[in-house]
Amino acid sequence: MTSERYNARDSEPRWQAAWDEKAIFVSKNDDSRPKYYVLEMFPYPSGRIHIGHVRNYTLGDVLARFMRAKGFNVLHPMGWDAFGLPAENAAIERKVAPKAWTYDNIAAMKKQLRSIGLSLDWSREIATCDPSYYKHQQKMFLDFLRAGLAEREKRKVNWDPVDMTVLANEQVIDGKGWRSGAIVEQREMNQWVFKITKYSQELLSALDTLDRWPDKVRLMQRNWIGRSEGLLVRFALDQATTPAGESELKIFTTRPDTLFGAKFMAISADHPLATAAAAKDPKLAEFIAEIKKIGTAQEIIDTAEKQGFDTGIRAIHPFDPSWKLPVYVANFVLMEYGTGAIFGCPAHDQRDLDFVNKYNLGNTPVVCPEGQDPKSFVITDTAYDGDGRMINSRFLDGMTIEQAKDEVAKRLESELRGNAPVGERQVNFRLRDWGISRQRYWGCPIPVIHCPTCDVVPVPDADLPVKLPDDATFDKPGNALDHHPTWKHVTCPQCGGKAQRETDTMDTFVDSSWYFARFTDPWNENAPTTPAVANRMLPIDQYIGGVEHAILHLLYSRFFTRAMKATGHVALDEPFAGMFTQGMVVHETYQKADGSYVQPAEVKIELGGNGRRATLLTTGEDIQIGAIEKMSKSKKNTVDPDDIIETYGADVARWFMLSDSPPDRDVIWSDERVQGASRFVQRLWRLVNDSVELGKAAPAARPASFGADATALRKAAHGALDKVTTEIERLHFNVCLAHIREFTNAFSEVLQRPGQPAADLAWAIREASQILVQLFSPMMPHLAEECWQVLGQKGLVSEANWPQIERDLLVEDSVTLVVQVNGKKRGEVTVATAAQNPEIEAAVLALDAVKLALDGKPVRKVIIVPKRIVNVVG
């Protein structure tokens, strides 16, 4: 038995260098083998990787190594999502240029990623801040512009007053900027937008084809796209109360059945009718100015107190000319959704009910639950939004909701006002066009020029890329490109007159919406993609990343791929065939008595009579053990990957990340379990070394036959191989590791038997050791390479083909059945797999436990559930 410990610090850099020297992870575009494209979402170069990165990239690496061993041409690239605000903040705070800060961070993080032992094709490395990348992004912007998929429009935007930039609705969290945390304001600005709404229905319908995506992600996208079927209704306005020139108010509703429960109309502060009314009412104008400050995001609207201002305007009910409804300007109605106007039916909408209760407008229920007396059915503080029959609705009374919807639609469609129907069935989507303009320096410049004579002029393709100036300064708030003395001043390419560059840069989500396509041929200097190559390598077979990107990044990428198809860059619609969302790495939090957090490395944990106790290492003071939460710098519950790799090695970190819980769930960091992973590494190392000694008696050729011991070991080895193969393909990595541990235990028991093994068993030991090393090689590649050499194998295990499963060995000779008497378990019986029912029955009835349970009673019948249970009924 070997007494030498496995030395990860010596082994891991050596094997990483060997992989690089042989370039075994470099994918060739002309490789004739079937392709497999695995990609983890590329990181932002913040300066250091965190432990979540280790988990994310290890998951993808296991799959990449496995598929390479299975004979695929694996594309497994890496790059950097390198534009963004932190670089500008660093420029301001640390007086360092964003470019220098970013590339220094890339170098540091690349070194860290290499230390994990990832099988990455670094020859395809890209950084989105490099002109060689964003040149092609600018080219596609111009292609989209020509195709009508990009345009400039004036629109209400979410303005972050701290970062001084526009935010998409998705980037506003609880009314605050997603990076700065500042309260978001509403402003009207010229914005460049991508016309994602042209694909609303297609993006929605295609979700049904993505059967290798998590259901929760598809549901989130469905909800965000937000398809709704309803009725556009034209309410006439009472001319005696309405500003000149206004005659009707259009609303879109998904509940036309509730029209007879209407108590008010509400319009957005940006609605033309509100503007017209405010022109003659200073108090209304003041109210509108106040509510505009809260922003345009739905999250803000939902949490704000419901406020309204009665304009004095009255709308006429479409089924009763004498019924007039007050028109309010309300802070919960957005111009961007529907028509910017609603009718309020408070009895059946909680928001509307809260509003009428505040302004004493009353409510009339028009849908009554089945079985309830309509006369006694009232609404007070809780709206009823369930099913039922129509009441208080004149000609609709007694109908179901769906019948009433259809009846209202038919009547209003047949009624004309000014040659147009009063009602029209429509489909609406919640999805809005993607505003990409950002008032920031460190982003991809938008390649257009503003000329006072020619208006907006695209930068000629020959002049791309439009590069960022390296000498920008950040001593003023706002966009450094605006402040630059020369960069924005140019000559118009059409008329030759003085003009200015667009100083907005693109939303960084644009950068990450097509990088996966660039990876297929990053050497093409003339076009974003080489279509023949991209069409062969795409879609990505397995994409891996956090669920926090389920809406923004994934939806934008799906749109971008369609836009690239429309402009000739790719030939597919969906970029990601398979999507996997990994869980987070979480950790306990630790706090002093004053509430301040301390790092795990500063805490000593002891087990006592009252459970776990934590103390501060430096002072011995008691520390409160808090909740298990997502790792964050603010709560100091982070673990530095470098420390773990330095102490235990990368393979231990990788094994722990894979073994503790299913990969789609959070994994709780545990020093004890990390130490357990380290012990398992040493155990494998000893086991492989021991197997070499015991395998020396093995004949060079495979024996013609195997005895019982050798057959049992071979069954265990090939059974483990079959299970691990299946579970890797299912991405059930924690289950794979459990099977490897199970086989390790069985193999260890064989190796510990006294004496020298017979020749056939020695051959089986040698085979089993090779299979074992290959089983854990995707998870612990450095240890596997070291063991591969110990076994005397040629080449690298990273180049070896995956072992072939001998399926004859998977057939069990016997099966163990649970034995019951009158439904209660009395024991077990093992019989031949091929045994017939009479043989099974005889074996069961011969058991002493069965005879004792029957206590002399006659057997009435024996029920046999094949390969599971035998129940004796007495």
UniProtKB/Swiss-Prot annotation:
EC annotation from Swiss-Prot or TrEMBL: 6.1.1.4
UniProt short sequence motif 'KMSKS' region, positions renumbered to this chain: 630-634
Catalytic activity: tRNA(Leu) + L-leucine + ATP = L-leucyl-tRNA(Leu) + AMP + diphosphate
UniProt-recorded Gene Ontology molecular function terms: aminoacyl-tRNA deacylase activity; ATP binding; leucine-tRNA ligase activity
Keyword match Protein biosynthesis: yes
Keyword Lipoprotein attributed: no
First-listed, main subcellular location of the protein, grouped into a coarse class: cytoplasm
GO biological process, one term: leucyl-tRNA aminoacylation
Motif ('HIGH' region): 43-53
Localization (cell): Cytoplasm
Keywords: Aminoacyl-tRNA synthetase, ATP-binding, Cytoplasm, Ligase, Nucleotide-binding, Protein biosynthesis
GO cellular component, as recorded: cytosol
UniProt superkingdom: Bacteria
CDD domains: Anticodon_Ia_Leu_BEm (cd07958), LeuRS_core (cd00812)
SUPFAM superfamilies xrefs: Anticodon-binding domain of a subclass of class I aminoacyl-tRNA synthetases, Nucleotidylyl transferase, ValRS/IleRS/LeuRS editing domain
Family annotation (InterPro entries): aa-tRNA-synth_I_CS, aa-tRNA-synth_Ia, Leu-tRNA-ligase, Leu_tRNA-synth_edit, M/V/L/I-tRNA-synth_anticd-bd, Methionyl/Leucyl_tRNA_Synth, Rossmann-like_a/b/a_fold, tRNAsynth_Ia_anticodon-bd
Residue positions binding ATP: 633
PANTHER family on file: LEUCINE--TRNA LIGASE, MITOCHONDRIAL, LEUCYL-TRNA SYNTHETASE
Family: Belongs to the class-I aminoacyl-tRNA synthetase family.
HAMAP family (alphabetical): Leu_tRNA_synth_B (MF_00049_B)
Identification of the protein by name: Leucine--tRNA ligase
Species of the source: Bradyrhizobium diazoefficiens (strain JCM 10833 / BCRC 13528 / IAM 13628 / NBRC 14792 / USDA 110)
Taxonomic placement: Bacteria, Pseudomonadati, Pseudomonadota, Alphaproteobacteria, Hyphomicrobiales
Gene: leuS
